[in-house]
């Protein structure tokens, strides 16, 4: 029971309120000084989202995460129930899409695992750029949210499913915490996937997407911090490598260094200008300067701490807006279209499509119309 409570997003207080008991009673159950009734145990198992029998195990079950965990942040812990459920949901969708492609005799995607974490950073970034037809020069013409959408569209056009959500499926009461993870990837050549925690700001999501693409390109998917403070240590760590590739993709040093040499204002003003133009964070700009020794480590971390103090909450767990526009964002537009086309071809049942996309069967037709399918 202690294990089940520890992995639950709520604490003892939440359980006590749901069961209409005092917290001391819950504490006694955990300590073995008392026991819930059969009905209370059933309700407790449902609240904690565990099989009923798990509450009475002497040892916690071994719950392996099905994808590698590359997180390095000091606060990183065992993946929460929310993160585990998101990974399971994404793997279910990825499995359907993989089978869908295999049945059509489609070829594996060549760039998945094309490089290794020992490859040249600039070469990997350039390959991603050319594969996606990613052109940084067009960014000043677009607002930040439009650039993020365009970036996602480019990635999906290349064959990678991109799913963005800030909650577990459609459960708005189960918000995903940026402090726990920013994204993860599945580097399957038949069905590569990137999941981005869109509880984060647009600029942070851009970096996370670029970071996860680096994981795809080296064939090592997993859970990521996508923390811009990781780097500059030359450790050969995968997260550090992917950060450096993301930095070079979004802020190519050859062009950035020239502007740095020609700057007229101060360091902080300059980073703000570049960040606004290219839809990245100011800390991301400063990180590139630190990475290429234009500023030292102390300057970078002083700036980072200063920016942290000034951050207002840019995070949002809202899934509001147009229901039919948000569904392809959560599920990947490419996957959504494939599922709907499969339904039209009588290859996938309406029930299965509804389960995969988290859309009521009665709303699938409207979703088709909104996407121009059929």
Language-model features, listed with the residues they occupy:
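Active-site hotspot residues in diverse enzymes, especially metal/ion-binding acidic/histidine motifs
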Residues: 1-374
């Amino acid at each position: 029971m202690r294990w089940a409570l520890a992995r639950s997003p709520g604490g003892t207080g939440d359980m006590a309120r749901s069961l209409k008991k005092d917290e001391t009673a819950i504490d006694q159950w955990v300590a073995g000084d008392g026991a819930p009734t059969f009905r209370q145990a059933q309700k407790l198992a449902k609240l904690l989202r565990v099989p009923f029998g798990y509450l009475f195990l002497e040892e916690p079950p071994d719950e392996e995460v099905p994808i590698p965990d590359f997180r390095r942040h000091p606060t990183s812990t065992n993946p929460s129930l929310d993160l585990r459920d998101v990974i399971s949901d994404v793997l279910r969708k990825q499995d359907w899409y993989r089978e869908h492609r295999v049945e059509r005799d489609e070829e594996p995607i060549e760039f998945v695992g094309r490089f290794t974490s020992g490859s040249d950073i600039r070469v990997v970034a350039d390959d991603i750029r050319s594969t996606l037809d990613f052109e940084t020069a067009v960014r000043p013409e677009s607002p930040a949210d439009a650039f993020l959408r365009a970036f996602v569209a480019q990635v999906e056009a290349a064959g990678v499913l991109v799913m963005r959500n800030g909650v577990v499926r459609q459960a708005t009461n189960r918000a995903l915490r940026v402090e726990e993870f920013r994204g993860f990837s599945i580097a399957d050549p038949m069905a590569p996937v990137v999941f981005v925690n869109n509880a984060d700001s647009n600029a942070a999501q851009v970096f996370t997407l670029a970071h996860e693409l680096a994981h795809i390109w080296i064939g090592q998917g997993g859970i990521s911090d996508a923390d811009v403070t990781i780097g500059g240590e030359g450790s050969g760590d995968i997260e550090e490598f992917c950060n450096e590739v993301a930095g070079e993709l979004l802020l190519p040093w050859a062009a950035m260094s020239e502007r740095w040499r020609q700057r007229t204002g101060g360091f902080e003003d300059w980073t703000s200008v570049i960040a606004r133009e290219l839809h990245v964070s100011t800390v991301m700009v400063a990180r590139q300067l630190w990475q290429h020794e234009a500023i030292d480590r102390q300057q970078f971390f002083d700036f980072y701490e200063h920016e942290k103090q000034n951050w207002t909450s840019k995070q949002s767990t809202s899934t509001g807006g147009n229901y039919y526009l948000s569904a392809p964002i959560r599920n990947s537009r490419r996957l959504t279209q494939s599922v709907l086309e499969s339904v039209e071809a009588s290859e996938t049942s309406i029930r299965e499509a509804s389960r995969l996309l988290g859309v009521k069967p009665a709303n699938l037709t409207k979703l088709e119309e909104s996407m121009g399918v059929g």
